[in-house]
Amino acid sequence: MSHYRQRFLQLALDSNALCFGEFTLKSGRISPYFFNAGHFNSGAKTAALAQCYADAIDAANMNFDLVFGPAYKGIPLATALACEYARRERDLLLTFNRKEVKNHGEGGTLIGAPLNGRKILIIDDVITAGTAIREALRIIRNAGGTPTGIAVALNRQEIASETNRQSSVQALMAETGIPVVAIATLSDLLAFVEENASLAKFYEPLLAYKTHYGTEASD
């Protein structure tokens, strides 16, 4: 497993962004783990998370000159990622949207650099149904930008339903043709748990969950 994947999973565990147990998901499934990026809630944690994002994005050789953060969770992620790239001496443009239209001041729904003519990376924490990402794609294209990649923290690699064996990530890539990179996947989480003696008791429930709900192809 790549070092940045291990760093991310350990950071998530230490930050309580990654928890093990029994969790009822919005889908009604009982999951043996839960991921909540809201627990990266300090400057140090967010900076460390941004390093992991940048490492994953660089490993995927994504081509972009602007980072777009969908409201709301994508906003601090995009800002932190742009700061991390500045630290690496690459100055990227930054834009995010607001969900409510502002009718005074600068107005509109976009804050930051103009999107027109830009190659744009969208960043978010996870892709569940893909609604926020699809809205971001619509906003970007309407503003004259070109979405060239999507980055998320964790890819759950989970089928949509028993009759639809694609994950939300696979469905989004098939629909849009835009590559999605994740810092880590459920497969990485399984390997991480297997290699950590203190987490050994969670391996079998995770494996059973992946066997039942996991996608057949890697994504």
Curated annotation (Swiss-Prot):
Query: What Pfam families does the annotation carry?
Result: Pribosyltran
Q: Which keywords, in A-to-Z order, does the entry hold?
A: Glycosyltransferase, Magnesium, Pyrimidine biosynthesis, Transferase
Catalytic activity annotation: orotidine 5'-phosphate + diphosphate = orotate + 5-phospho-alpha-D-ribose 1-diphosphate
Q: What class of enzyme is it?
A: transferase
Keyword Transferase (UniProt): yes
Name any cofactors this protein relies on.
Answer: Mg(2+)
**Pathway participation:** Pyrimidine metabolism; UMP biosynthesis via de novo pathway; UMP from orotate: step 1/2
Q: What is its EC number?
A: 2.4.2.10
- Which GO terms label this protein's molecular function in UniProt? magnesium ion binding; orotate phosphoribosyltransferase activity
Instruction: Output the PROSITE patterns linked to this UniProt entry.
Output: PUR_PYR_PR_TRANSFER (PS00103)
KW Cell division (keyword) present:
no
Q: Where does 5-phospho-alpha-D-ribose 1-diphosphate bind?
A: 26, 72-73, 98-99, 102, 104, 124-132
Any single biological process term in GO: pyrimidine ribonucleoside biosynthetic process
Of which family is this protein a member? Belongs to the purine/pyrimidine phosphoribosyltransferase family. PyrE subfamily.
The name under which this protein is listed is Orotate phosphoribosyltransferase
Q: What is the lineage of its organism?
A: Bacteria, Pseudomonadati, Pseudomonadota, Gammaproteobacteria, Lysobacterales
